[in-house]
A protein has these predicted regions:
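Flexible loop/turn segments at secondary-structure boundaries
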Residues: 5, 13, 78-80, 89-90, ...
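Two-metal-ion RNase H-like nuclease active-site motif
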Residues: 64-77
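C-terminal reverse transcriptase regions that engage the nucleic-acid substrate
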Residues: 1-62
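Helix C-cap/alpha-to-beta connector motif
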Residues: 117-121
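Short coil/turn segments at beta-strand junctions that form active-site/ligand-binding loops
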Residues: 67, 122-125
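Mobile genetic element proteins and their domesticated derivatives, centered on retroelements
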Residues: 19, 72-74, 82-83, 109-113, ...
Length: 153
């Protein structure tokens, strides 16, 4: 029922990932039996409390309108880059980062890109272009139920 409400609850997908991961783990443990009981993590309980406390005041908009600016980002195993309005920046990954999965690197590149241009994009609607379809999906859906590490970014 939570996912059915997403069109009417702005940022709703940000607040159900732990519950969804708990459900997936429980179904795996019970071999797909929905009639079994499951444990709910403290994080999932926090998400449920948030939903219960805001159910009367949630809303969403039909459209966020046209973007004020467009930012392009890219990442590889060696580093990341981005451009905004003809200005480019980027950097190499440190050793620990370069060993991460490419999905994590692409999301991190978007985060670094936004941080790099904070002064230029503050209070603006930014369209982000990425060549990585999995990350585009992850951003559009406000996270993933498959990688807690990406959600923490």
């Amino acid at each position: 029922m939570l996912t059915a409400s997403f069109p009417g609850v702005m940022f709703g997908p940000l607040h159900y990932r732990n519950l969804d991961m708990d459900k997936t783990a429980a179904l795996k443990f019970s071999r797909g039996n929905y009639n079994k009981t499951m444990a709910i993590s403290d994080e999932a309980k926090h998400e449920l409390r948030r939903w219960m406390s805001s159910v009367e005041t949630t809303f969403s908009v039909v459209s966020h309108g046209q973007a004020d600016m467009t930012m392009t980002t890219d990442a590889s195993k060696t580093g990341w880059e981005c451009s905004l309005g003809g200005i480019s920046t980027g950097s190499s990954w440190d050793l620990g980062e370069s060993e991460k999965h490419i999905n994590w690197l692409e999301v991190k590149a978007i985060l670094f890109s936004l941080k790099s241009f904070t002064d230029h994009i503050s209070k603006k609607h930014i369209k982000i272009l990425s060549d990585h379809t999995t990350v585009v999906c992850c951003i559009n859906h406000m996270g993933t139920s498959h990688s807690q590490e990406i959600n923490f970014l």
